Curated annotation (Swiss-Prot):
It catalyses: N(6)-acetyl-L-lysyl-[protein] + NAD(+) + H2O = 2''-O-acetyl-ADP-D-ribose + nicotinamide + L-lysyl-[protein]. This is NAD-dependent protein deacetylase. Residues 2-243 form the Deacetylase sirtuin-type domain. Its cofactor is Zn(2+). Zn(2+) binds at residues 135, 138, 148, 150. One of its GO terms (molecular function) is zinc ion binding. The active site is at residue 127. Belongs to the sirtuin family. Class U subfamily. Binds 1 zinc ion per subunit. NAD(+) binds at residues 28, 32, 39-40, 109, 111-112, 127, 188-189, 211. One of its GO terms (cellular component) is cytoplasm.
Length: 252
């Protein structure tokens, strides 16, 4: 066993054991074990051009959607297809933390719907979800097709580059961050704004960062774990359950 790895995990367990109000803030890295492509990792989507011509940020912009819908739809189908994806151990660990009563809210930058599929109840989607599509003409919920039965254009219920976030979701996310005594941030480089800015509203005691690369908040964190999100959270929940069922845990 890796003693340093275990030491970090046990430290997180100790923090969660004394946590009353946990909020989770996650990015693409929380879903990579489910088959979702990362964005800014070394092999992420943003490292390559689509059709050797378009930057992903360009394709996923509001302007591009309206001017090149066919290319936009093909890109989403090829690179952002969420059909058949299943929650990983990290997602399921968050469900267990919610059942235990520690986790109060999941704030996600992801658009894959995996937190809801896994069973989390209070999920705040900052960027929307690819599971939902709607008609721009009649507003009716629609299938993932080019047009609605009314003849209108259909688009995904996600925030594209150049668009504002849903303010009601933002307000609730800020409220949850303000209430938390512990915040776990995982699977995100914290470079996407304005979403990353909202962490400034956290005033709690414990900021935990779980990521495979450095973030701008590492220096402010109580604990930084550079490891796989799914592995860490699965281990943490198993150790917490040992405590819950009266088993002793070394160093806790």
């Amino acid at each position: 066993m890796d003693s340093k790895r275990d030491e970090k995990i046990l430290e997180l367990v100790k923090i969660l054991k004394n946590t009353k109000y946990l909020v989770f803030f996650g990015g693409a890295g929380t879903s990579t074990d489910s088959g979702v492509k990362d964005f800014r990792g070394k092999d992420g989507l943003y490292k390559t051009l689509y059709k050797d011509k378009y930057r992903p940020e360009e394709v996923l912009s509001s302007d591009f959607f309206y001017s090149h819908r066919d290319i936009f739809m093909k890109y989403v189908e090829k690179e952002l297809n969420i059909k058949g994806l299943k929650p990983n151990k990290g997602h399921m660990a968050l469900v267990e933390l919610e059942k235990i009563g520690i986790l109060k809210a999941v704030i996600t930058q992801n658009i894959d719907d995996l937190h809801q599929v896994s069973g989390n109840k209070n999920v705040l989607e900052l960027h929307g979800s690819l599971k939902r599509w709607y008609c721009l003409s009649c507003g009716k919920t629609a299938d993932r097709n080019f047009s609605c039965e009314c003849g209108g254009v259909v688009r995904p219920d996600v925030t594209l580059y150049g668009e504002n976030l849903n303010q009601s979701v933002v307000n609730e996310a800020i409220y949850q961050l303000e209430q938390a005594d512990t915040l776990i941030v995982a699977g995100t480089s914290l470079t996407v704004y304005p979403a990353a800015y909202y962490l400034r509203y956290f005033r709690g005691k414990n900021l935990i960062i779980i990521n495979d690369m450095d973030t701008q908040y590492d220096g402010e964190a109580s604990l930084v774990i550079k490891d796989n999100f799914s592995y860490v959270m699965d281990r943490v929940v198993k150790e917490l359950k040992k405590i819950q069922f009266g088993k002793t845990l070394k160093n806790i």
